[in-house]
Amino acid sequence: MEAHGHFDIWVDNKVVLARLRGSWNQEMAQRYADDFKQVAQPFINGRWAHIVYLDDWELGTPEFESVIAELVTWVIDNGLKRTAQVYSPSMLKQYQMDKLVKESINDFERRVFREESEAFEWLSHEGYPVQRALLHPMSA
């Protein structure tokens, strides 16, 4: 089956940034998981963070959830400590994200922000500053 949806993913300092767009199926989720793992390789067994932009994301099919759930386990097992999700209030997005990613597990913490600046401020306060001038996304 053809992948549906799009993403940009890039790294800045010890932060993996991603922008998701469109409605996602299992194939797009797998492509994202594979690219995410590749980009995160330099941080494995260290402490790192993630920020994801979800305003243009239109949710995922039920089949996509198992792929993302496996990715969530992988990132936490490999040193992810903070995740900032950026999107305007949406009960559907919140439901799907809450289903896939717990708010906290051991020393991992996830927070949701309306504004990018709030997410950057929180990550910086937590020890993960982002230099916006260094954003180099790779797209799918």
Model-based region annotation:
Residues 1-140:
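Amphipathic, Lys/Arg-enriched alpha-helical "gate/interface" segment within cytosolic domains
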